[in-house]
Structure formats: C-alpha cells, structure tokens
C-alpha cells in the first residue's frame, strides 16, 4: 500500500501537532512529498524538520480562502502538483451550550467546517490534474455518531463535515477524485493530555481495547484512503476508536 504513495504530493492542514503531525509522519515514511501547514509557519517548519523525509512546512489559514489558494499554489509549485489533501485542521475549545457565546460558536465553525470547504475548494484545480486525486477529511466520532457534553459546537462541525463529504464525493467523482473521512475516537494528543491524567484513564477504561489510540493510528487510516488500493472507495468513513462507540462502551462511559 505504501508503494503507491511514493513520490506523491501531499498537503496536511493542521499538521504541526497532534493528529495532523501523525498523519504527516505516516505519509512521509511512505515516501510521499509532504507539506505540513499550520497557522504558525515556524511550528510547521519545526514539525517538518522533526519528521524529515523531505517534508516541509508552510504557513496558512484555513479560515481564509485566499490563504488556502496561496498555499495550494505554493505546494503544487514546489512538489510538481498536488495528489492528496488531508483536511485535518480543527479546534475543539470546550464550551457548555448554555454558556456558549456566538463568537465561540463561530470560531469553531469557521475553522472546522468552513475551513474544510476552503481547503477542498482551493485544492480542486490541482487534484483534477492528478491521476490519483484524494481528499481525506479528519472528522470525529463526536457529532456524526455520538455526543460529548461541552462540545456542542465541535460535534456540529464534525457532523457537518460528513454531510459535506457525502455530497462533494459525488460532485468530484467525474474528475476521478475520491473524498473520504476518518473518524477518530480518543487519541493521545496535546489536547487530550491537557485534560489531565484521570480523564485519560477514564477514557481508556471505556474502550474495549482498554487503551487510547495514537496519532499514527489515524495516519494509517488516511494512508489507506489515499492509496491506489482505495481507488474504488469514495464517500466512506473509517472509525478509529478502539471500539469506543459500541453500546457496551458508551454505557460504561456514562457510568464513569
């Protein structure tokens, strides 16, 4: 599977840390030419240096279509085109529904949902020229499948991403571009670690595999969607959650 990614041009938005960094690492190790994008160019460059394998960092803002158009051109110019977009950029600041402000709602929607639209729209002209155009969206089990208190805005954007994906895959099929999504459960990232050790233990205990996922787990799922082995797969999702959404797991979590 990894052989089909060798030499392919890949852009990972939100790739300087967390899940995005894991995705970038997996693709780079598979021989792809990886561009890591972050709102902070220095962080993207630092992540690229750490990952190696010819990866490079670039600054960009998914909340701006003009910024994403500039990023796509820069990546295509440097890598000789664009084959894979991993639309991963996202934020998840907690806010309870009754206390949430309109500004808090808009910030998450602008980054997670509108940012996905901007990224995909800007990538289309370049993906159309690829013989293996791929779009892989990082969604979540929160929103599309289950809910999580304190993240109403986040869940809404993640459900929205799947609605976007299921229509975009139909519109872009005529160009041979596939559009799929990976739905992570609880993955060990800087954000999860910041919630405290007890939170991590509670989440791990609620998962049938009795452990949390690592960022590379999401990277391997994204790698499959981007590979030639997934040529006939579009409009689909892969849930990477260790079995967390199984009924027994949700019951255990509710009782925790």
Predicted regions and their residues:
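Substrate-binding pocket helix/loop in short-chain dehydrogenase/reductase
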Residues: 96-97, 104-109, 192, 203
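Short, small/polar-rich loop/turn modules that mediate ligand/substrate recognition or access, typified
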Residues: 86, 173, 178, 233-235
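Conserved glycine-rich cofactor-binding loop
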Residues: 9, 16-18
């Amino acid at each position: 599977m990894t052989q089909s990614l060798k030499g392919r041009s890949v852009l990972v938005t939100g790739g300087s840390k967390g899940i995005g960094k894991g995705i970038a690492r997996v693709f780079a190790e598979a021989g792809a030419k990886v561009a890591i994008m972050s709102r902070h160019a220095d962080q993207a460059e630092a992540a690229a240096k750490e990952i190696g394998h010819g990866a490079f960092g670039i600054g960009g803002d998914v909340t701006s279509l003009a910024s994403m158009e500039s990023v796509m051109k820069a990546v295509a110019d440097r890598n000789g085109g664009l084959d894979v977009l991993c639309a991963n950029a996202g934020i998840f600041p907690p806010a309870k529904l009754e206390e949430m402000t309109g500004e808090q709602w808009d910030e998450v929607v602008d980054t997670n949902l509108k940012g996905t639209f901007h990224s995909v729209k800007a990538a289309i002209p370049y993906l159309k020229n690829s013989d293996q155009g791929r779009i892989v969206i990082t969604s979540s089990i929160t929103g599309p499948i289950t809910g999580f208190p304190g993240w109403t805005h986040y869940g809404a954007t993640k459900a929205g991403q799947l609605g976007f994906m299921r229509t975009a895959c139909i519109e872009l099929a005529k160009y041979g571009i596939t559009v799929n999504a990976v739905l992570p459960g609880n993955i060990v990232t800087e954000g999860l670690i910041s919630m405290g050790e007890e939170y991590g233990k509670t989440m791990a205990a609620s998962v049938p595999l009795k452990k949390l996922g690592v960022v590379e787990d999401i990277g391997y799922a994204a790698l499959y969607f981007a590979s030639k082995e997934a040529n006939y797969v579009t409009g689909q999702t892969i849930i990477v959650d260790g079995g967390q959404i199984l009924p027994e797991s949700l019951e255990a979590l509710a009782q925790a």
